[in-house]
């Protein structure tokens, strides 16, 4: 035990980095286990869309949406979700909802808000449209 104490005292910065990483890892595990949504892959997204009538909700800007989006995706801004304006999603609360952004990071809050608003099956495309493109999945360009 004294050897550990001596090591930590001699390598204080290294020890603090390890403690910080451990705390961050624990926080990440707790956050993902308590999230109101689940993260899914591009393949799981296509299965939800094709087999369970899943709806893709793209929360990127209008310009980004026009440059390329998943087929049949619904474009809703995060500000609309925060305000409770769900548009065409309002009558699809029991259908699978897949929230998509560019990287999968900014969609987390929107996914949580949708789940809290009563949407029963909310998912998040893990790593966003970057993962979708890396899986060689198609994007539709233009207004839709």
Predicted ranges, named:
Residues 1-39, 48, 54, 62-96, ...:
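Rhodanese-like catalytic fold shared by cysteine-dependent sulfurtransferases
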